[in-house]
Amino acid sequence: HWNEEEPPEIPVECAKCHSTPGYLDFLGTDGSAAGTVDQPAAIGSVITCVACHNEATLTMTSVVFPSGAEISGLGAEARCMQCHQGRASTVQVDEAIAKNVGEELDTVSPDLGFINIHYYAAAATLYGTQVQGGYHYSNKAYDAKFDHVAGFNTCVGCHNPHTLEVKVDSCKLCHTNVASKDDLKNIRMAGSLVDYDGDGDVSEGIYYELDGLRTLLYQAIQAYAAEIAGTPIVYDAATYPYFFIDTNANGSVDEGEAAFPNAYNAW
């Protein structure tokens, strides 16, 4: 969408992960300081082979996440994690609250907005509480990285690094009920006996436990928005900025509601 901007260029804050020159700038292979992007990139300068295959990435062993947490001791997966980490974390949410909310946390603030972690934040998901990609309450405990078996414990261990497709043929060597990527949703370890989403089913795949928890979270958000914030809310994963005012308070996204002018504003 930067084609329509003036000037038409990939901005500094986006160039690292949306262009080869931007990523090389971040790595410092262009002679600039490593760790930051100094210049916008040209439209059309997409990610090419040299972005991930160069002298800097060959020796990269650590990655710093938006929370400030640094994960070290990495291998080839480090080059993936530099971009598949999101752009926000617990830290950014807490900073926004501290800056824009008074002592009464339930008071709507016109200075608040939805903080989007950004897209495909797989590395933040993988490392859990170690990097705090999702919001963490200070008095709660959260899971860290799940240690898989040797050889399948990194991004590139389970995914083709170029197509991003899961290596299903490798998965089914141990997960014998897996024939296709859709079957991955049915995986559940024998020791997982907790009914996380409270639906009474402890045999469903962990994917479905998480999906159930997501439904419960959405219901809680909608209840809070209607009862405390005073403005009903709906969510549409396919339309920016994703959260919208539920104008008829029916709990569903209806025609005309998922539009930017109707973005939710009672945070």
Which role fits each region the language model picked out?
Residues 1-78, 82-160:
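Sequence context of c-type cytochrome heme-c attachment sites
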Residues 23, 89, 164, 223-230:
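Intrinsically disordered or highly flexible coil/loop and linker segments, enriched in small
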Residues 182-262:
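Acidic, glycine-anchored loop motifs typical of Ca2+
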Residues 150-189:
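Structured mid-domain segments that build the active-site/substrate or prosthetic-cofactor binding neighborhood
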Residues 9-12, 75-78, 150-153, 166-169, ...:
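Generic recognition of stable, solvent-exposed alpha-helical segments in well-folded globular domains
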